[in-house]
């Protein structure tokens, strides 16, 4: 978990975990967020303790507490790509994301997940573009799914 963790950066709907006996509790974001919950927070969403195994080995709600590198913004992503490839890559990204999400990603309104960054890099490679895609900026955040 980041040392400068800000509880208020988590979505209000983020489910907390109360299972302190879980074998993976020290690595689970849901448990770590629960431990850092401010007393001013009157109500939170929690995972039903009866729904998960007590050891947490096969927990479907587990989220790794290590932040990953998200990209933000694609305004200049295609600037150094040949025009013929630009048109094809842009069309493929819109087909992948959908028009609304594509433009939200371009305008820094939505973070671009690591898997999505890999997909875009694959589009570049398939068009013969050897340069690594450069997004507007990068930010460490937790992969919430």
Describe every region a protein language model picked out.
Residues 3-5, 9-11, 135-145:
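Short, charged recognition helix plus adjacent turn
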Residues 69-73, 98, 116:
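N-terminal positioning helix adjacent to the helix-turn-helix/winged-helix DNA-binding module
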Residues 33, 107-108, 125:
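Residue-level detection of the helix-turn-helix DNA-binding "recognition helix"
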Residues 98-113:
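Recognition helix of helix-turn-helix/homeodomain-like DNA-binding domains
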Residues 63-90, 130-134:
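A short, Lys/Arg-rich alpha-helix, primarily the initiator
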Residues 115-133:
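DNA major-groove recognition helix of helix-turn-helix/homeodomain DNA-binding modules
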Residues 90-94, 121-124:
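The alpha-helix within a helix-turn-helix
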Residues 1-62:
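N-terminal cysteine/histidine-rich coordination modules
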């Amino acid at each position: 978990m980041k040392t400068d963790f800000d509880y208020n950066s988590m979505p209000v709907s983020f489910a907390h975990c109360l299972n302190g006996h879980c074998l993976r509790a020290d690595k689970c974001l849901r448990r770590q967020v629960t431990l850092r919950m401010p007393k001013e927070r009157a109500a939170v969403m929690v995972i039903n303790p009866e729904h998960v195994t007590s050891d947490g080995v096969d927990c479907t709600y587990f989220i790794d507490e290590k932040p990953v590198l998200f990209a933000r913004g694609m305004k200049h992503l295609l600037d150094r790509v040949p025009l013929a490839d630009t048109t094809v890559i842009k069309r493929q990204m819109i087909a992948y994301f959908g028009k609304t999400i594509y433009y939200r990603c371009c305008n820094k309104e939505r973070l671009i997940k690591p898997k999505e960054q890999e997909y875009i890099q694959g589009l570049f490679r398939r068009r013969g573009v050897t340069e690594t895609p450069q997004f507007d900026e990068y930010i460490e955040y937790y992969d919430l799914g």
